[in-house]
């Protein structure tokens, strides 16, 4: 199951989510930094090579909605400097501070006054673009990008499991949680398939996957980092939803006879386009 089977139920998603309350809790930001999947080297290489088609000298990248810097640090080997920007102070506090060409700032994707116009080779957003004011973010990207600069939006689908019994339960779990997703996540559930970047010649890459074997506890740790779990717990404080998920996963694994862990796969998508040359 990718996110696709849930897309028809997007109308169940919430219209009453206070985005300002998201990722302000240090425990959740630490869980995000520790338990979210790390992007593969193939993703960073794919985007960097696309950038070099029009700007071979990769001087500056900006990673907006960077969270604790999981994608920012992946681009560091390709660019002379990269700046990670996130609106959450706790996410930025969890970013690494020992990479010489990485800088992290608290800020909004649509307001980057500390970046000079026409100086950026790559403006990117990983697993966060759906949270942003899109038209304003595109306008700010256009301001800071060099002619020929690249805009890249990427992310991953909901995880799938290789054990049928586990996969069946995961679908039930996501259906239970979908009312706790904000409406701005609708396109993310559809892998941004209808998203149009502001430049001509947009390309899409759906060929990269990320797989990792997880125990039940490791999967629970991943779920702890997600917003729907936080929202569900806030509205249903009497329930132990993570404990329930753990019990159901353990039972599914026991029923399958497949051992104590399972293979989890995230399908990655990338959208890229070049700003036209002058």
Question: How should each PLM-predicted stretch be described?
Answer:
Residues 113-122:
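A short acidic, Gly/Pro-enriched loop at the edge of an enzyme's catalytic core
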Residues 58-60, 118:
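Nucleotide donor/acceptor-binding cores
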Residues 125-126, 134:
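A short beta-strand submotif of the Rossmann-like class I SAM-dependent methyltransferase core
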Residues 132-140:
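A short, conserved alpha-helix within the catalytic core of class I
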Residues 2-56:
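Conserved class I S-adenosyl-L-methionine
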Residues 60-62, 67-112:
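Class I SAM-dependent methyltransferase SAM/SAH-binding core
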Residues 191-278:
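Conserved Class I S-adenosyl-L-methionine
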Residues 142, 146-214:
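Conserved catalytic/acceptor-binding region of the Class I
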């Amino acid at each position: 199951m990718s996110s696709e089977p849930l897309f028809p139920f997007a109308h169940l998603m919430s219209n009453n989510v206070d985005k300002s309350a998201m990722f302000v809790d240090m425990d959740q930001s630490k869980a995000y930094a520790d338990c979210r999947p790390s992007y593969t080297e193939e993703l960073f290489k794919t985007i960097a090579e696309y950038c070099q088609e029009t700007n071979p000298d990769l001087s500056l990248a900006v990673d907006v909605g960077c969270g604790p810097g999981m994608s920012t640090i992946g681009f560091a080997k390709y660019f002379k400097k990269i700046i990670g920007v996130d609106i959450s102070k706790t996410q930025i506090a969890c970013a690494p501070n020992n990479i010489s060409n990485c800088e992290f700032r608290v800020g909004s994707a649509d307001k980057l006054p500390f970046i000079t116009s026409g100086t950026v080779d790559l403006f990117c957003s990983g697993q966060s673009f759906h949270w942003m004011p899109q038209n304003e973010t595109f306008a700010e990207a256009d301001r800071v990008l060099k002619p020929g600069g690249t805009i890249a939006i990427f992310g991953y689908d909901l995880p799938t499991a290789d054990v049928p019994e586990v996969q069946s339960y995961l679908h039930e779990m996501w259906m239970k949680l979908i009312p706790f997703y904000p409406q701005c996540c609708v396109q993310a559930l559809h892998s941004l398939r209808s998203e149009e970047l502001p430049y001509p010649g947009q390309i899409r890459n759906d060929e990269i996957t990320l797989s990792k074997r997880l125990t039940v506890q490791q999967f629970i740790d991943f779920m702890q980092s997600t917003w729907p779990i936080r929202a569900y717990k806030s509205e249903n404080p009497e329930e132990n939803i993570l404990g329930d998920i753990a019990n159901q996963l353990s039972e599914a694994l026991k029923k399958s006879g497949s051992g104590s862990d399972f293979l989890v796969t995230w399908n990655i998508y990338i959208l890229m386009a070049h700003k036209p040359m002058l």
